[in-house]
Amino acid sequence: MTVEEVGDDYTKDGTVDLQGNPVRRSIRGRWKACSFVVVYEVFERMAYYGISSNLFIYMTTKLHQGTVKSSNNVTNWVGTSWLTPILGAYVGDALLGRYITFVISCAIYFSGMMVLTLSVTIPGIKPPECSTTNVENCEKASVLQLAVFFGALYTLAIGTGGTKPNISTIGADQFDVFDPKEKTQKLSFFNWWMFSIFFGTLFANTVLVYVQDNVGWTLGYGLPTLGLAISITIFLLGTPFYRHKLPTGSPFTKMARVIVASFRKANAPMTHDITSFHELPSLEYERKGAFPIHPTPSLRFLDRASLKTGTNHKWNLCTTTEVEETKQMLRMLPVLFITFVPSMMLAQINTLFVKQGTTLDRKVTGSFSIPPASLSGFVTLSMLISIVLYDRVFVKITRKFTGNPRGITLLQRMGIGLIFHILIMIVASVTERYRLKVAADHGLIHQTGVKLPLTIFALLPQFVLMGMADSFLEVAKLEFFYDQAPESMKSLGTSYSTTSLAIGNFMSSFLLSTVSEITKKRGRGWILNNLNESRLDYYYLFFAVLNLVNFVLFLVVVKFYVYRAEVTDSVDVKEVEMKETE
């Protein structure tokens, strides 16, 4: 290889090895490195969903908690698991770097899994058994037992906070957007990334859930713990092949500086003279594998932060690029807010949807019964099929009409997912109304622990539709927040996606408790321990209306959203999307 060829072989996006040396694309990165990351994600998702998918069943049958309390405990924990990535993104972007942050978080994650497995195994800290189907008559778990169990759960949540935002960004960092070939490969990365996630989830929702229901919780939690150990080992084996990006400073501090500086100069007269605004020379950015961002007309009040007036203190004067990066993170907030409602719908899968399944006939054959939580596997299976069809069929067809390499824009893809969510809750409401009719027809409304003469597969449509919705909304959401985030804030951008799920779960807890209390005071409660006495159909119909209102707000947000564009080879895709939204 000639000197010129060696020079061209080095990445142009500022990626380095762990020692900080420039890296060659023929040795590190691309799909060779991503293969370790993707396989890690398969096993890690198997571990995580091996716990979360059946957690509602464990809390109702082993901790002897009621429907509302169990649902809220699950959604509060899941919400925390999705919220801690904000802290993980901060540490990865500003302090330790993504790789080191990820490895330390893996150790915390694994310790939580180990203690959780012990909490369902050792007699002294394992909750007492109960033979009755009425949880109100069962002996409650002791304070010590609850402390160990929930302590392990939330330790696990802290660990995932450092892994979730950094692992997907590490994977995306393996592709240099300045190289046309790697730029093209990166366009499909998020689709296959989600494919790996839901493949691991499918195994958890089927095999692991069956083991937990039919063999025991010790093995049922021990296998996910082993899976996590395997996933961490696989990731570490790929270390010689990874590209890394150096920490670029706290994105939160950078955004705070811009906001503070703009308020300090609130009375300063504005100008359109570009020389009046502070910016570093282009060479400063090139040395870091970055580039300056030109001023944009939106959120003009923030431009004062880079106005050359007053002192040059960093909390009084920012660069134009820092201002534009802050603008972009703020511009994405309305889109983030729109995703909260569909995230609430996802929270129903492993709580109320599963609770419905416990009341139905679960027999598939004479001797085999499907665990209620395994219905979540149909969400996964539906999504896997939908992603492949989307990537291989839908994109190719729509690309011919739109000229967009993605087929349609990311926001258009989100919009289709939002329409699916309206349909899902209508279908769920109709199905629940039919389930209540079957209970009434057979005189089983006031019976607990008795299975209705209705197959559990009556719930299948709402699970399948949820998977189809995810193939549009969840994939687009992850890619949108990564793609639209500035280069120095990619992990923070990715954490927007996890924040959406966190807030959605917390909102689900709040709404479930509120609706349950209000409806009980006004007569027949909508959500009771005995679902046959509840009106879950009304609750789902309320969700359908909520999704419809949310979709209308989404249309307003899309109308005013301006896509981010940067001076890189990857701008081609964004230019097409900007033209389509004009």
From Swiss-Prot:
Family assignment? Belongs to the major facilitator superfamily. Proton-dependent oligopeptide transporter (POT/PTR) (TC 2.A.17) family.
Q: Which Pfam families match?
A: PTR2 (PF00854)
User: How the protein sits in the membrane?
Assistant: Multi-pass membrane protein
Localization in the cell: Membrane
Species assigned in the record: Arabidopsis thaliana
Top-rank taxon, per record: Eukaryota
Disulphide bonds in the chain? none
Q: Sorted alphabetically, which keywords does the UniProt record give?
A: Membrane, Transmembrane, Transmembrane helix
What up-regulates or down-regulates this gene? By wounding, salicylic acid, abscisic acid, methyl jasmonate, salt treatment and amino acids histidine, leucine and phenylalanine. No induction by glutamic acid, methionine or tryptophan.
- Bilayer-spanning residue ranges: 77-97, 100-120, 141-161, 189-209, 217-237, 334-354, 370-390, 408-428, 452-472, 493-515, 538-558
What this protein is called in its record is Protein NRT1/ PTR FAMILY 5.2
Q: Coiled-coil stretches, from where to where? A: none
